[in-house]
Amino acid sequence: MIKVIERDGKVRLPFSRGILTRSITSVGVDVDLAYAIATEVQEELIRQGKKVVTKEEIRNITYQKLVEKGFKEEAKRYLFWRRFRKLKIPLIILLGGPTGVGKSTIATELAFRLGIRSVIGTDTIREVMRKIITPELLPTIHTSTFLAWKELRGTVTGSPIIAGFESQVNAVAVGVNAVIQRAIKEGLNAIIEGIHLVPGFIKIDYEMAFMYMIVARSREELEARFYERTRYSKRSAQYYISHLDEIMEIQEYLIKKAREYRVPIIENVELEKTISTIMEDIMEKTVEIMKKKGLDMLEEPK
């Protein structure tokens, strides 16, 4: 049995092809091929007569195997994410976007690939606030975002739909900002997703916090997503489709805010493409941040 240790030799765990396969698939390699590469890495260690091996040695052999098979970009990403994990820097990913666009699915997949345990939906934060704050005190949080305008009091300037939405966002953002600050303070990785993540309302004063606006390419595409959603949701597709005008108006507002605050806008057409776009963007920005600190995250192993 091959044992894996840290540099200080304190931790000894059995080598796992499954864990290595997951690491390789996280950079976009098909699972069958990733398992084959993990097997080759294990065979290489056996051939070298290794009984004890460091994580760095495994990383270097895996990198070479990826390069040999023509996966140069994947090898680069693999190297980056392994090194980034080692730095133990808290990573905060924020995924905003309208109802039904696929934010939860994206968040779950990102969490799996990056090994992030904490995935928080802003709907959950809103639900907690509903238990604390009565409808009489703050009525707009006690309904759907696209119906919050019906609970507004007084005169409204501009679109009532957006005014109601902003009222709910303004309240929920307090909880969201508290969650972000706690994650940073505790040194925890976190992915937060939800319609309430609106640029300008969410405080992002941490260099390793990355925000993305996920949107639907068209009204028809979003409508199709609602029908797909009925497979695991108690609410019928018709509930959302009957309010599609309001939802699309909110999407246009979110796009406008994202452009204003230079938040990347991603049309969620294919899950794999969306995930790759986000991970690639985080990598590129992190490489630049670390370069300013004298660290080369993409230096090839010797």
From Swiss-Prot:
Ranges of residues in domain ATP-cone: 2-89
The entry's keywords: ATP-binding, Kinase, Nucleotide-binding, Transferase
GO MF assignments: ATP binding; kinase activity; phosphotransferase activity, carboxyl group as acceptor
Annotated catalysed reactions: (2R)-2-phosphoglycerate + ATP = (2R)-2,3-bisphosphoglycerate + ADP + H(+)
Tree of life domain: Archaea
Stored Pfam families: ATP-cone
ATP-binding is among the record's keywords: yes
Cofactor(s) listed in the protein's UniProt record: a divalent metal cation
Metabolic or biological pathway: Thermoadapter biosynthesis; cyclic 2,3-diphosphoglycerate biosynthesis; cyclic 2,3-diphosphoglycerate from 2-phospho-D-glycerate: step 1/2
UniProt EC number: 2.7.2.16
PANTHER family per record: P-LOOP NTPASE DOMAIN-CONTAINING PROTEIN LPA1 HOMOLOG 1
Family, similarity comment: Belongs to the 2-phosphoglycerate kinase family.
Described function: Catalyzes the phosphorylation of 2-phosphoglycerate to 2,3-diphosphoglycerate. Involved in the biosynthesis of cyclic 2,3-bisphosphoglycerate, a thermoprotectant.
Protein known as: 2-phosphoglycerate kinase
Annotated organism of origin: Pyrococcus furiosus (strain ATCC 43587 / DSM 3638 / JCM 8422 / Vc1)
Lineage, opening ranks: Archaea, Methanobacteriati, Methanobacteriota, Thermococci, Thermococcales
Gene name in the database record: pgk2
